Amino acid sequence: MSRTMLITGASSGIGAETARRAMAVGWRVGLFARRRAPLEEIAAGSDDALVLPGDVTDLGALEGAVAEMAARWGRLDVLFNNAGIFAPAGLIDEIDIADWTRSMDVNLTGMFHGARAAFAQMRRQEPQGGRIINNGSLSAHTPRPGSVCYTSTKHAITGLTKTLSLDGRPFDIACGQIDIGNARTPLVEDLIARGGTPEVMDVGDAARSVLHMADLPLEANVQFMTVMATKMPHIGRG
């Protein structure tokens, strides 16, 4: 039986590339993002893709997406909890409170919503269990200047990962985190345009790393994986 994966933020970047590669090797993939059109393009009419438009800030939308996957394919094996945004850079006393709130809503609460919906399904399905992969960042280790919003959320994701890894053990739910340093995506291209670091790697290298984590049996888990552009000068540039 083909395994199933829900990917949030699946319309572009790492999410889209992971979806394409997963379907190419036999995964059934739920594609979740706000914009339907790019999801339809990625799905391209495939029976192994399910287009699930929605916003990660809406818990009901994610619960509905998980329920739709379970109704069609019987279960959810993996959540790639991927959706996220960059906020405008600045010192803490220059940051617009709306940008802080939006960062927390998408990068932290959105991932909480995804994990909550997936955990509930994995806990009750038969056979029980599954895997949650949270997309962190090198910013989960050390920040780049002016990144108080983004860095704060990514440090919080590390706490989410550790707690889910512990709480999931009785139910065969594994949780790990991938911390990616500058895969070439629209988000990173925008960062470069604003004067950020030019050291990047192909987005496919990040997607292959996600699939390595997803492919493991539930008796094994990559708790934390860091994959980064080789020429990044130091980890603090994540």
Please provide the spans of the model-predicted regions.
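Substrate-binding pocket helix/loop in short-chain dehydrogenase/reductase
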Residues: G90-I92, D99-T101
